[in-house]
Regions:
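Extracellular/periplasmic catalytic domains that process cell-envelope and extracellular macromolecules
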Residues: 86-88, 112-117, 169, 204-207
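Bacterial N-terminal signal peptides
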Residues: 6-15
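Catalytic cores and adjacent binding grooves of peptidoglycan-active enzymes
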Residues: 135-276
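Acidic/His-rich structured neighborhood in mature extracellular/periplasmic domains
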Residues: 100-154
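Positively charged n-region of N-terminal signal peptides that target proteins for export
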Residues: 1-4
Length: 276
């Protein structure tokens, strides 16, 4: 019994402190019912579901990363939004990272996307034929923000981008959408009529080439930790102004040395990482 307990403890500690690279090396999901365990930036995913790489109104990109796994509610969100976008006469969406087969920290690109309830959707579209597999790894992905970070790039931004964000913000199960400060500002300045959906747009650094949807913890996932609320109104006042008055937040260059990302995960993630 003592040997068994020591083995179990060792496995638990390994999973809880495992590096992002160790999570990325697991290429398949676990069996069993889908469960989001932990928080968006420190958790894992049991029983993940794969997004089909092609569907009506969308195609997945950068699929070699193997980050097209998520909660069923996330997969349904993407496919339903894509159908709405297609019905609105827009070109198919590029779907980026959702999560790894068992969630957990990723070795590049994200601190979140760990419990299957986050997804990146790119502002760039492909109005023509679907991309060949090789093209999906590095498609053109233009920013909606000027290169000098001085405002919206009006040669790229169109009303279709505003419509896309509104359609996403009005979807059920959506907690928030992370967007760049300039995008939020433009919409705050131009949207008329029903502005309630603007509340869902939460400013964060980057997010000028894509927007990041985050869904609520689904019912029946008791180990999923919800995120605190945000704006009481549309978020177009002081919360937005602060992004333009406080010192700018800068990201390190892509080639900067990085410490292995090792968030403290829930103990239950041990079984997720080590399951067959």
């Amino acid at each position: 019994m003592r040997a068994f307990l020591l083995t179990l403890l060792a496995a638990t500690l390994t999973a809880v402190t495992a590096t992002a690279q160790e999570w990325a090396q697991v290429t398949t999901p676990t069996a069993g019912p889908t469960q989001s365990i932990g928080f968006y930036t420190a958790g894992c995913l049991q029983g993940a579901q794969a997004l089909p790489l092609d569907g009506p109104g969308y195609e997945a990109i950068r699929v070699s990363r193997n980050r097209y796994w998520g909660q069923p509610v996330t997969i349904d969100f993407i496919t339903t939004l894509s159908e709405k976008v297609r019905a609105a006469g827009q070109a198919p969406l590029y779907i980026g990272d959702i999560g790894q087969p068992r969630g957990g920290p990723a070795p590049s690109g994200h601190a979140s996307h760990q419990i299957g309830l986050d997804a990146d959707i790119w502002f760039e579209r492909q109005p023509g034929p679907r991309l060949a597999p090789a093209q999906r790894e590095n498609p053109r992905l233009r920013s909606l923000v000027r290169a000098d970070d001085g405002g919206i790039d009006d040669s790229v931004f169109t009303q279709q981008h505003a419509t896309l964000l509104r359609l996403a913000a009005e979807m059920p199960h959506l907690d928030r959408i992370f967007v760049n400060k300039w995008i939020k500002q433009r919409l705050c300045q131009t949207v008329t009529g029903n502005r309630a959906w603007l509340r869902k747009l939460v400013v964060w650094i980057g997010h000028d080439e894509h927007f990041h949807v985050r869904l609520y913890c689904p019912p029946g996932n008791p180990q999923c930790q919800p995120q605190a609320g945000y704006y009481a109104d549309d978020g177009c006042g002081e919360p937005l102004d602060l992004w333009f008055t406080r010192p700018p937040v800068t990201m390190p260059p892509p080639d900067a040395p990085r410490q292995p990302y090792r968030p403290k995960l829930p103990a239950a993630c041990a079984a997720v990482l080590t399951a067959p």
